């Protein structure tokens, strides 16, 4: 896999961000967060819930569940 190839994590989060798909994020301590993905990098996710922004460290994330399906398309062959 070369550097220009996106990984599934980036494809998933970017698709949720671009299409404004609401997500539920479960943290490793069991806490549940809901909102829209506003941005992300290698270590964090910015989540917006009714104007309240949260920065979540990815190492604290257990599961991310979208409210509607995330479609994966691979433009590379």
Swiss-Prot record:
Q: Does the keyword Lyase apply?
A: no
Example of a GO MF term = RNA binding
Q: Where is the Sm domain?
A: 10-70
GO annotation terms (biological process)? regulation of DNA-templated transcription; regulation of RNA stability; regulation of translation, ncRNA-mediated
Does the record's keyword annotation contain RNA-binding?
Answer: yes
Might you report a single GO cellular component term?
Answer: cytosol
Database matches in InterPro entries: Hfq, LSM_dom_sf, Sm
User: Keyword annotations for this protein?
Assistant: RNA-binding, Stress response
Please give the superkingdom of this protein's source: Bacteria
* SUPFAM superfamilies xref list: Sm-like ribonucleoproteins (SSF50182)
Instruction: Note the PANTHER family from the entry.
Output: RNA-BINDING PROTEIN HFQ (PTHR34772:SF1)
Sequence similarity? Belongs to the Hfq family.
Q: Name the job this protein performs.
A: RNA chaperone that binds small regulatory RNA (sRNAs) and mRNAs to facilitate mRNA translational regulation in response to envelope stress, environmental stress and changes in metabolite concentrations. Also binds with high specificity to tRNAs.
- Subunit relationships: Homohexamer.
Q: What is this protein called?
A: RNA-binding protein Hfq
Species assigned in the record: Clostridium novyi (strain NT)
